[in-house]
């Protein structure tokens, strides 16, 4: 309505203009008529704009705007609660944040946030990864503060597409104040007594030094540790003391992507302390720190750590009667695959189609398969022998390889799930190359990838090319 009034006013102005130019009235009269027409059109336009703004302002808000306002209010409130400012200490008996029992379907915003977090996992420094995914800041008795991860935070920091809880991000933490009497009571909230995380620091929490150490242990093959131990075992008794183990740890860490990217940052407090944390040194070398660590005991520690991380990963899927669905197991296998999203979706749909009413998988079945994956290099060799001999890589062959190489039994149901994922043409035979490459990435949990976007390597290649070209010009053949 308002727009029609404005258009009619402009039309009258145009008619007046044509009349002005088409008549022979005196010049003064024409000017007065033109001025009146212009002022009238301006007044109509201005009043129309004011009325339109008033009508729009008085209209009731939409449902979406209500939700947005409520979300903004909740966000500002929660942000104030979890702010990392030193003066806003929380209650001493505050509970750890509750995990969502059921995962809602990811919306556009959630997908973009998860893509951003995946880039942090892949390309950021260990300092930033730790500060982003850690959720607790602990204030001790002297008033000093230190940031910690829970075991769940640690698993989330190395698992793609696991979204950080709302209002907890970079330098945003739940603040807790501990005293000596509360430590024993709080410990079981973060780690079970039988878990390897229970031995870490206070209450089973993970400091920055622990985080670097654990990622190093997870991303290093067992064989590398065996060689490093033998290099520093000068007397050949298979044991190393604390100083020798620190050297082993330093060398191994320098070969990992986390170690290569780490730089001590005193401003954030994330620096690698000399030696391990006191709890781990006691665990490895005894209370007096004069004990010896054997390669057997350390590899047992590595095995327990892998078991506990896998257990936490299994429990994140909220098992029903101790079982997770076949699709959830497939998601665990493909979590670090790097497969394109379209192909990944197609593989998951294929899995859902095969197991609409599946019975699920127990933790023991999942653990047996991951024990099989620990020997993936030997598995690759064995499968290659079968392939060269002309034998088909069917389920019976996979079970035979598992018994021979890893000394574990793979259930028929686990093999059915694996073949549903990697049997591309549906002929009942495994796609060997794709299966082995994806399983190698799964075993390393993506920690073996270089933590850069290739720009540095590109510059180095260009510099090397320029040097060689300049040398060719200087010394022509």
Curated annotation (Swiss-Prot):
Residue range of the transit peptide in the UniProt record, numbered on this chain: 1-33
Pfam families assigned to the protein according to its UniProt record, in alphabetical order: EF-hand_5, EF-hand_8
GO MF entries: calcium channel inhibitor activity; calcium channel regulator activity; calcium ion binding; calcium ion sensor activity; identical protein binding; protein heterodimerization activity
Annotated ranges, domain EF-hand: 220-255, 356-376, 410-445
The organism's place on the tree of life at top rank: Eukaryota
Keywords linked to the UniProt accession: Calcium, Calcium transport, Disulfide bond, Ion transport, Membrane, Metal-binding, Methylation, Mitochondrion, Mitochondrion inner membrane, Phosphoprotein, Repeat, Transit peptide, Transport
Family matches, as Gene3D superfamilies: EF-hand
Sites where the protein binds Ca(2+) 2: 423, 425, 427, 429, 434
Compositional bias of kind Basic and acidic residues: 66-84
Stretches the record annotates as Disordered: 55-108
GO biological process: calcium import into the mitochondrion; calcium ion import; cellular response to calcium ion; cellular response to calcium ion starvation; mitochondrial calcium ion homeostasis; mitochondrial calcium ion transmembrane transport; positive regulation of cristae formation; positive regulation of mitochondrial calcium ion concentration
Region ranges (Polybasic region): 101-112
Post-translational modification (record): Phosphorylation at Ser-124 by AKT1 impairs its maturation and stability.
Binding residue positions for Ca(2+) 1: 233, 235, 237, 239, 244
Ranges for region C-helix region: 457-467
Modified residue annotations for Phosphoserine: 124
UniProt key word Repeat: yes
Region of interest called K/R-ring, as start-end residue ranges on this chain: 128-131, 261-265
Sites bearing Asymmetric dimethylarginine, chain numbering: 457
Chief site of localization: mitochondrion
InterPro entries from the UniProt entry: EF-hand-dom_pair, EF_Hand_1_Ca_BS, EF_hand_dom, MICU1/2/3
Function: Calcium sensor of the mitochondrial calcium uniporter (MCU) channel, which senses calcium level via its EF-hand domains. MICU1 and MICU2 (or MICU3) form a disulfide-linked heterodimer that stimulates and inhibits MCU activity, depending on the concentration of calcium. At low calcium levels, MICU1 occludes the pore of the MCU channel, preventing mitochondrial calcium uptake.
Family label: Belongs to the MICU1 family. MICU1 subfamily.
Domain description: The EF-hand domains have high affinity for calcium and act as sensors of calcium levels.
PANTHER family listed in its UniProt record: CALCIUM UPTAKE PROTEIN 1, MITOCHONDRIAL, EF HAND DOMAIN FAMILY A1,A2-RELATED
Name of the featured protein: Calcium uptake protein 1, mitochondrial
Organism: Rattus norvegicus
